[in-house]
Regions:
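A composition-driven signal for long, intrinsically disordered, charge-rich low-complexity tracts
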Residues: 12-16, 112, 381
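Feature for long, exposed domains in two main contexts
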Residues: 1-71
Length: 381
């Protein structure tokens, strides 16, 4: 060749003659023998591109390029083999400050994994209420980012990394120096040995800015929840004001029932562990969302080594050895406006006073997102 060579590339590839400046097109002299290629995929899996080489007086040449896009994940260990129990020098909770991922601009998802190992004495015999919280630096309050029920007798080793939670909603709190708290309502000296890890998954976030405020915070333990079937003074009505630059908003609720209050439902199902119910979320006085507290498939739990524990029968919205589901409800901003009234309305039922009390441990958060920096919603009684 006596003429310069023009190169052009397709797909998520860039080319350069100096390994510094990369673009879709480059021209090199006829004597050049080295070209640099940069692969910047925007999706996972096998990706194909092409380089076209052209020079006056010569036939063009096409070179196929292939690359495999993989997801970039930044992993951090928070609590590491932290024992939680009661008596024998153990505590039911532990809190600590950890350094988590700093730059959240290209983080699409945040996953949390929780593994329970057993001490030499074996794990706790019972299924226990348990959760993970992050401290809100502004208020000092603890926000519940995940709840689960421990398995009977065993840990979570049937799962490679234990229980998995999507905590992306709280990513504005899970960056830099973060204070976390773990809790298990374990009343024995058979301590649960807990490890918590976070995966920060790279990708294009739906919105660059998130903010969160707590609406209902009855999540200290299984019987700190809202009493069910009796009169109570728990405040379930709130006013929520969201920032004017909110582009997306949703409610995030975790709810689980406890207790064996009567009268039993058909089939001998007492409340609130076993009784199937449908609760309503009201916006400005109208029922907008329903939370069905029904079966979620306890018998199909992959942590299936919980015998002789009573793990297979379906509870109302939770299972031993499983994550308590998050109930996410998108808000229609065109109808709610920037200020609206919220009410959590439990299905009507009256306890007869026998069988003990019934409780619903309940947490609800308002999550707002925007393309510009956004402040937290204001929640008032």
């Amino acid at each position: 060749l006596s003429q310069p060579v023009n190169l052009s590339v397709t797909g998520p590839f860039k080319i350069s003659s100096d390994n510094i400046n990369f673009s879709n097109n480059v021209q090199v002299s006829s004597g050049s023998s080295e070209i640099f290629i940069k692969f910047s995929p925007t999706q996972t899996g096998l990706i194909v591109g092409e380089i076209l080489l052209e020079s006056p007086g010569a036939e063009s040449v096409e070179v196929t390029l292939t690359g495999t896009g993989i997801t970039v994940v930044h992993s951090y260990t928070a609590f590491n083999q932290q024992p939680l129990g009661f008596g024998g020098g153990f505590n039911q909770s532990a809190s600590q400050v950890f350094s988590l991922h700093g730059d959240m601009s290209n983080i699409d998802k945040v996953k949390m994994f929780l593994q329970i190992d057993c001490p030499s004495s074996g794990c706790d015999d019972w299924d226990r209420f348990a959760n993970v919280k992050v401290k809100d630096p502004a208020s000092g309050n603890w926000f519940e980012i995940g709840r689960y029920i421990t398995p009977y007798w065993v840990g979570t080793q049937q799962l490679d990394r234990g229980l998995e939670f999507d905590v992306t909603d709280f990513k504005s709190y899970l960056t830099g120096e973060v204070e976390l708290r773990i809790y298990i309502e374990n009343w024995t000296a058979k301590a649960d040995i807990v490890t918590v890890e976070f995966d920060f998954v790279e990708g294009t976030p739906d919105y660059p800015y998130y903010a969160v405020s707590e609406v209902l915070g009855y999540h200290i333990n299984s019987i700190d929840g809202v009493p069910y079937g009796v009169d109570h003074n728990f405040d379930l009505d709130k006013n929520i004001q969201i920032p004017n630059n909110t582009e997306s908003a949703h409610l995030r609720t975790i709810i689980s029932g406890w207790g064996h209050a009567t009268p039993n439902d058909i089939g001998g199902r007492p409340c609130a562990e076993w009784c199937f119910r449908t609760h309503n979320v009201k916006i400005n006085g109208s029922s907008m969302f329903q939370h069905y507290m029904g079966p979620i498939g306890c018998a199909s739990n992959p942590i299936n080594n919980q015998n002789p524990g009573n793990w297979q029968p379906d509870r109302a919205g939770w299972c031993p050895g499983m994550v308590v589901p998050v109930r996410s409800n998108d808000l229609d901003l065109s109808s709610t406006g920037s200020s609206f009234n919220f009410e959590y309305d439990f299905e009507d039922w009256v306890s007869d006073g026998a069988g003990g009390n019934a409780y619903y441990a309940t947490s609800t958060y308002i999550v707002v997102k925007s393309s510009s920096q956004i402040s937290s919603p204001i929640v008032t009684d």
